[in-house]
Structure formats: C-alpha cells, structure tokens
C-alpha cells in the first residue's frame, strides 16, 4: 500500500466512526430522556420501558456499528491496497 | 508475563483448502465445539423429564417460554408455532456463539494463523444466518398467502414498490452487519484494552461486552421474527 492510500484510509476510518457516532448519540440521548420521563410519570411501568429502551438503543447503536464496519474494512481489508 | 488473552488479528484466518474453496477453519472449529456443547446441554436437560422441573430442565423450560413469547408477539397467534423452532435455533446459536467467544479463553490454544473466537465475529457466519432469515420470510409469505404475498409490495400505494424491493436487500445487509460489527467491536475493544492495561481495567468492559452480546442475540431473533410476521400478516 502506498503512503497516500494508507493515510487516506486511516483518516477515513476515523471520520467514519466519528461522524457516525453523532446521530446515534443524539438519538440515544433523546430516547433516554423519554424513558426517564416515562418512568418518573409511571414508575410501575419501569420494566417494560427498560426493555424497550435497551432494544431501541441497540438499533441506534447499530448505525454507528455500520460506520465501524466501514472503518474496519478500510484498516484491515483495504480494497485499494 | 501474563498470557495474551486477546489480540488484534482481524484479517488473518486459518485457511482450509477444499477443492477451489478456501474456508475460514477457525470459524468451523469454534462453531462445531459450541454446537456440540449446546446439543449436550439440551439433551441432558430433556433426558429425564419430570412433572415439576428442576435444575437444567427448569432453565430449558424458561428458555422455551421466553422464545415462545418472543415469537408470539412478533409473528402473531396464528402461525407462530410453525416458526418457533427456527427463531429458537437462531436465538440459541447466536447467543451461544457470542458468549462462547467471550467466555472461553480460546487464546490459550495456539493456531498456525488467525485465532479462535466467536463464530459470529466472522462476516460469513452472519451473512449466512441473515440470508436464511430472508429465505424463510419469503417462504413464510408465499406458503401462507400464495401469490397474494406480493400485494405487500404495493400495499398502501404502488409508489412504495421500489422502496419495498430495496428493503428486501437492506434487511439481510443490516441484519448481518449489525451482528458482525457488534461482536467484532466487542472483541476489538477488549483486545485494545488488554493491550494497553492488562490488569483489572478490561473486566468492566468485558461485562459490557457480555451484555451487548446477549442483547444482539435477542435483537437478531426479534428481527427475524418480525420480518416473518410482516410477511404473513393479513392486510385488510
């Protein structure tokens, strides 16, 4: 791999995870806020709310994970090298 | 020096050459071991069944209840029984491979190249599982509704047709990438931390990894059930 390609790959890998973490971060914050408000309003529904919250967290997290997959491909299985 | 429990060997595999096909041997080894363990575990638990369950049988009945509830809420009362074995198999296999990859110190066994680990940390395993899910929701839709299944593609309006067709491709893609990325990310984070601070500090991260692995198995099974439920659902 020439040095330009490897430098660009490393920068792109960093950007893929970094930018990809912004949206899900905001979304998880919103979801947690909603869950906390829901629990405060109706403490007996805590179990159900927690289950749904964890499931939706995992969905949001998977968006960042897609970025991570792209980063891993660039770092370990680079198609341009 | 402490033995190295995790290392960063992402692109390296133990290759088996069979004809023209190159197989990733370490994935086969670990998944055979874990499947064997699962089989032994379940046949021990169901060998002497009693009316009021104890020990292993109790645990297995709890699992059965859990999987049945999952399938029933996603697929619906009418056909969930047909799909419960499939959903249960997916859930147990993914769960056992995630936890087996994290809990068993595979690193102590030296391989000529690559390392043993969770079978689901290899993209081929997860893509195979995701394609199985795709095939089964097509089969579920076609066998339950016949050609009327394709009404689903134009259901609210025909404008949705291209998006629904695209969805058939993005479903397996996201299903496989989600599982693969999460499990590989867990292994990588633990690997990096062990590399930086070999003592104590990686332990909370390992627990977090176990937690996310269990959630990912649940999500994989839930989504598979949801796709099947979407395919067999009747529109009015």
From Swiss-Prot, chain A:
Q: Where are the transmembrane segments?
A: 7-27, 57-77
Q: Give residue numbers for the site Reversibly protonated during proton transport.
A: 61
What keywords are annotated for this sequence in UniProt? ATP synthesis, CF(0), Hydrogen ion transport, Ion transport, Lipid-binding, Membrane, Thylakoid, Transmembrane, Transmembrane helix, Transport
Keyword Nucleotide-binding assigned to the entry: answer is: no
Major subcellular site: membrane
The family database entries (SUPFAM superfamilies) matched by this protein are listed as: F1F0 ATP synthase subunit C
Q: Give the domain of life.
A: Bacteria
Gene3D superfamilies the UniProt entry points to: F1F0 ATP synthase subunit C (1.20.20.10)
Record keyword Transmembrane present: yes
| Gene Ontology terms: cellular component | plasma membrane-derived thylakoid membrane; proton-transporting ATP synthase complex; proton-transporting two-sector ATPase complex, proton-transporting domain
**What is the recorded membrane topology of this protein?**
Multi-pass membrane protein
Q: Which PROSITE patterns match?
A: ATPASE_C
The record, for Pfam families, names: ATP-synt_C
Tell me, what is one Gene Ontology molecular-function annotation carried by this entry? proton-transporting ATP synthase activity, rotational mechanism
According to its UniProt record, where is this protein located? Cellular thylakoid membrane
**Matching NCBIfam families, A to Z?**
ATP_synt_c, PRK07354.1
Its quaternary organisation is: F-type ATPases have 2 components, F(1) - the catalytic core - and F(0) - the membrane proton channel. F(1) has five subunits: alpha(3), beta(3), gamma(1), delta(1), epsilon(1). F(0) has four main subunits: a(1), b(1), b'(1) and c(10-14). The alpha and beta chains form an alternating ring which encloses part of the gamma chain. F(1) is attached to F(0) by a central stalk formed by the gamma and epsilon chains, while a peripheral stalk is formed by the delta, b and b' chains.
Task: Please give the function described in this protein's UniProt entry.
Answer: F(1)F(0) ATP synthase produces ATP from ADP in the presence of a proton or sodium gradient. F-type ATPases consist of two structural domains, F(1) containing the extramembraneous catalytic core and F(0) containing the membrane proton channel, linked together by a central stalk and a peripheral stalk. During catalysis, ATP synthesis in the catalytic domain of F(1) is coupled via a rotary mechanism of the central stalk subunits to proton translocation. Key component of the F(0) channel; it plays a direct role in translocation across the membrane. A homomeric c-ring of between 10-14 subunits forms the central stalk rotor element with the F(1) delta and epsilon subunits.
Stored HAMAP family: ATP_synth_c_bact (MF_01396)
Q: Which family does it belong to?
A: Belongs to the ATPase C chain family.
Designated name of the protein: ATP synthase subunit c
Organism phylogeny = Bacteria, Bacillati, Cyanobacteriota, Cyanophyceae, Synechococcales
């Amino acid at each position: 791999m020439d040095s330009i390609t490897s430098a660009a790959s490393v920068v792109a890998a960093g950007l893929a995870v970094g930018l990809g973490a912004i949206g899900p971060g905001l979304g998880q914050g919103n979801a947690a806020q909603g869950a906390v408000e829901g629990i405060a309003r109706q403490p007996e529904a805590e179990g159900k709310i927690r289950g749904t919250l964890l499931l939706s967290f995992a969905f949001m997290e998977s968006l960042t994970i897609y970025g991570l997959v792209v980063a891993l491909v660039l770092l370990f299985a680079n198609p341009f090298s | 020096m402490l033995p190295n429990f995790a290392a960063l060997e992402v692109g390296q595999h133990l290759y088996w050459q069979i004809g023209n096909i190159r197989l990733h041997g370490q994935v086969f080894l670990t998944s055979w071991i874990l499947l064997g363990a699962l089989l032994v575990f379940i046949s021990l638990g169901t060998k002497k069944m009693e009316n009021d369950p104890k020990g292993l049988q109790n645990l297995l009945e709890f699992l059965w209840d859990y999987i049945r509830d999952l399938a029933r809420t996603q697929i619906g009362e009418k056909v969930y029984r047909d799909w419960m074995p499939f959903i249960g198999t997916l859930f147990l296999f993914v769960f056992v491979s995630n936890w087996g990859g994290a809990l068993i110190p595979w690193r102590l066994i030296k391989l000529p190249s690559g390392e043993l680990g969770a079978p689901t940390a290899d993209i081929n395993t997860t893509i195979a599982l995701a394609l199985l899910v795709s095939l089964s929701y097509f089969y579920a839709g076609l066998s339950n509704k016949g050609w009327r299944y394709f009404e689903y593609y134009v259901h609210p309006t025909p404008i949705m047709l291209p998006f629904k067709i695209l969805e058939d491709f993005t479903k397996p893609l996201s299903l496989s990438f989600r599982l693969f990325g999460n499990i590989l990310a867990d292994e990588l984070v633990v690997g990096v931390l062990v590399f930086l601070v070999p003592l104590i500090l990686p332990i909370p991260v390992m627990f977090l990894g176990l937690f996310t692995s269990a959630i990912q198995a649940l999500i994989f099974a839930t989504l598979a059930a949801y796709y099947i439920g979407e395919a067999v659902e009747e529109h009015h």
